[in-house]
């Protein structure tokens, strides 16, 4: 797989091989295959040896020192038992000792549609592949969505189980409020505030939980809309969890990171901004946009990427 690597920027890449919605020209998300993802927070392409067996991946990958193409040391793959709770320093994702870290793993598809993959065995298998993070994609609007006709208790239980399975396997986990077809995250902001307050209260003492408060603002949602939403939801998390990393989606299906550069969220630490990239659809213009934002010092977290087209 190929991914974007930029100098001096903490980038988490979660690559998804099924469509998760149209960015720029997509209309709906495919509800077919589970998404595979990969994350990076490195200065150059990861050159780790692909010949390691699964046992070595499980026992070594979490603390493995990565190198860049010129042989210089880069960030390390992280695990909660060694690296503890993560935070943001400048544009970088770092561990409890301020060492740059790398996360890479998978994102589920909609929890309501594919609950059978939220098991300890699945997480253990992902761990054996070298994954150290799982993104729990909980749709909010679509069929079975948390804010529409979904069973909220069932969805919360799936999230809670996922957090525990990640902890069991020494992995990080992202609780993803998967805004998509509703477009503007403010539509269900009151529900989001209640949900994230509940999650943060439950997991404030955990060192492996990251919150993603809006997957893909779209359909005309502006950065002003997203920033207002963030100002409403972030306090619900910070009331209980003072320093967890919080990810904020950007307009245009999380492509317009340049908007966040011009007017970032202020008053809170450990904030990152998401960018989504699909190689068959998004070309050099999006890479240039990412590079410009990174050069400006924006903490960027690529919470979805795929080698397919944006519409699956």
Task: Please tell me what each predicted stretch does.
Residues 1-7:
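Bacterial N-terminal signal peptides that target proteins for export
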Residues 10-11:
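Repetitive helical segments and hydrophobic/amphipathic motifs
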Residues 15-19:
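C-terminal motif of bacterial Sec signal peptides marking the signal peptidase cleavage site
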Residues 24-79:
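N-terminal, intrinsically disordered, polar/charged segments of Gram-positive cell-envelope systems
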Residues 60-133, 149:
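N-terminal carbohydrate-binding accessory modules
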Residues 85-86, 110, 115, 132, ...:
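Extracellular glycoside hydrolase catalytic/binding regions
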Residues 118-182, 189-194, 238-240:
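Aromatic-lined substrate-binding rim segments of carbohydrate-active enzymes
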